[in-house]
Swiss-Prot record:
The lineage of its organism: Bacteria, Bacillati, Mycoplasmatota, Mycoplasmoidales, Mycoplasmoidaceae. Component of a cohesin-like complex composed of ScpA, ScpB and the Smc homodimer, in which ScpA and ScpB bind to the head domain of Smc. The presence of the three proteins is required for the association of the complex with DNA. This is Segregation and condensation protein A. It comes from the Bacteria. GO terms for cellular component: cytoplasm. The gene is scpA. Participates in chromosomal partition during cell division. May act via the formation of a condensin-like complex containing Smc and ScpB that pull DNA away from mid-cell into both cell halves. Its main location: cytoplasm. It is found in: Cytoplasm. It comes from Ureaplasma parvum serovar 3 (strain ATCC 700970). Belongs to the ScpA family. PANTHER family: SEGREGATION AND CONDENSATION PROTEIN A. One of its GO terms (biological process) is cell division.
Length: 294
């Protein structure tokens, strides 16, 4: 049996369709997953056996063009299997067989990566399709004339805070993109404040990034209201100088201010947080399809 050239392998056997992934490589990846084979230490003999059995079952049902690709891959696997089974002492031939085997493994790993990426992009596309774009609005009309507006504590960058908030809400909603309506869940401000401080106290050097704190929060009973309240609590703690911050790349490093933290929380500060969070809407609606999981 004549060996197939490297160029033939690259041009025919390893082609894939970006959306459907219906071809020889996709079949091999499915077989590897079903048989729980180690793709990094692939047993070519077992894989070729499983693949040939699959092609034999497929011959009478599959389109002739697609079948041709599968037959070419089956032929290549049988050739590689035969070369591996034949005894040889030629080091160059042994190295050639191992190179071909490793080339197949590398192609499968690369293909599987593209496949996973395609599935991720598909999920992102479906999630984005559930959202609606609004034109830029002027929010000054919603400002209360008799309210006292204070600047952000210690000159925090509002754009960084916005990026963090957008990222947190987006990732949370991506995990729950089938939710249609989020019911109101009441949060205890004092407990949430304690939750944050305990997390920082237990972190190395009593410091952690804002994103890492939100990442470890359980999805259950967490919605936009929760994240808005937590953001206000963080700002209040910074304003009270109970936690310090350091700017990172689109994030903030929060650190316990040991000199100011006390176990008995100031009730007036807690009341301040409650007053701020009470202005949050109580009928939060997210434009997602499905049922509520809270």
């Amino acid at each position: 049996m004549n060996r197939m050239s490297e160029k033939q392998i690259q041009n025919s056997l390893f082609e894939y369709k970006f959306i459907d992934f219906n071809g020889p490589l996709d079949t091999l990846c499915v077989l590897i997953k079903q048989k729980r084979l180690d793709i990094n230490n692939l047993d070519i003999l077992e894989l070729s056996k499983q693949y040939v059995n699959f092609v034999n079952q497929l011959i009478k049902t599959i389109d002739i063009d697609i079948l041709g690709d599968h037959l070419a891959m089956a032929s290549y696997l049988l050739e590689l299997k035969t070369r591996m089974l034949m005894p040889t002492v030629d080091e160059k031939q042994i190295m050639s067989i191992e190179e071909d085997r490793q080339n197949l493994i590398d192609r499968l790993i690369e293909y599987n990566g593209y496949k996973n990426l395609s599935e991720h992009l598909k999920q992102r596309f479906e999630f984005r399709a559930t959202m609606m774009d609004l034109p830029q609005q002027d929010y000054e009309q919603f400002y209360l004339k008799d309210a006292i507006y204070k600047p952000l504590p210690n000159h925090l960058d509002s754009m960084i805070l916005k990026n963090i908030m957008d990222k947190i809400i987006y990732e949370n909603e991506l995990k729950n993109y089938k939710i249609n309506k989020i019911k109101v869940h009441e949060y205890d401000v004092k407990q949430l404040e304690q939750l944050l401080l305990n997390y920082l106290k237990q972190s190395p050097n009593q410091q952690a990034s804002m994103l890492s704190f939100f990442d470890i929060q359980a999805v259950i009973d967490k919605n936009k209201r929760f994240f808005a309240i937590m953001f206000l609590i963080i700002l209040i703690l910074i304003n009270r100088n109970e936690i310090l911050f350091e700017e990172l790349d689109n994030d903030y490093l929060l650190k316990i201010n040991i000199e100011r933290v006390v176990d008995d929380y100031n009730s007036s500060s807690v009341e301040q947080a409650k007053n701020l969070t009470s202005n949050l809407t109580k009928d939060t609606i997210i434009n997602f399809k499905g049922e509520d999981n809270e």
